[in-house]
Amino acid sequence: MARFRGSNWKKSRRLGISLSGTGKELEKRPYAPGQHGPNQRKKLSEYALQLREKQKLRYLYGMTERQFRNTFEIAGNQHGVHGENFMQLLAARLDAVVYSLGLARTRRQARQIVNHGHIEVDGKRVDIPSYTLKPGQEISVREKSLKLDIIAESVEINNFVPDYLEFDADNLKGKYIRVPERSELPAEINEQLIVEYYSR
């Protein structure tokens, strides 16, 4: 299944979550798009709730269904709680960490920054957004990309870096210190519904 490339604003309103990370999509119209507007919400079936939760998380990270499902299966082979493992694996993706460090304003922008070869991991260029970081690995902006406006502007407006990451804003370097706790990951996601969806 291809990655969704349509309007993130409409998709955000339909799913009830900000896919850009800015929250602007839901400020004026916190309801699904369409002529019926706020009145078109209806009670969803159990399956529909599970599907919507899966789509929320998949679109949030900008992944294809195959990528998403593969990561879910990897999480299932780890020790611990399946859903929590899954959320932690997603948070350890290189594009997710670039976004969380504040090197990009949105997750989509973070993917582009990685794809275009602006990021190094432990001193080596990595242009794969799905690259999974391990605790202790260092992330930095390549020397030739240090003066990119898109990165400088993002860092300037960012005022929060999660505790599982370390960031040196002056040198545009960060570190993935540890696996995040569930409480440090998106609270608006109910990953158990996703586990139930794939267990059907």
Swiss-Prot record:
GO terms of molecular function: rRNA binding; structural constituent of ribosome
One GO location term (cellular component): small ribosomal subunit
SUPFAM superfamilies the UniProt entry points to: Alpha-L RNA-binding motif (SSF55174)
Annotated spans, Disordered: 20-41
InterPro entries for this protein: Ribosomal_uS4 (IPR022801), Ribosomal_uS4_bac-type (IPR005709), Ribosomal_uS4_CS (IPR018079), Ribosomal_uS4_N (IPR001912), S4_RNA-bd (IPR002942), S4_RNA-bd_sf (IPR036986)
Positions of the S4 RNA-binding domain: 92-155
Keywords recorded for this protein, A-Z: Ribonucleoprotein, Ribosomal protein, RNA-binding, rRNA-binding
GO annotation (BP), single: ribosomal small subunit biogenesis
SMART domains linked: Ribosomal_S4, S4
Record has Repeat as a keyword: no
Record note on quaternary structure: Part of the 30S ribosomal subunit. Contacts protein S5. The interaction surface between S4 and S5 is involved in control of translational fidelity.
PANTHER family: 30S 40S RIBOSOMAL PROTEIN, SMALL RIBOSOMAL SUBUNIT PROTEIN US4M
Family to which the UniProt record says this protein belongs: Belongs to the universal ribosomal protein uS4 family.
Function, in words: One of the primary rRNA binding proteins, it binds directly to 16S rRNA where it nucleates assembly of the body of the 30S subunit.
Name used for this protein in its record: Small ribosomal subunit protein uS4
Species of provenance: Staphylococcus saprophyticus subsp. saprophyticus (strain ATCC 15305 / DSM 20229 / NCIMB 8711 / NCTC 7292 / S-41)
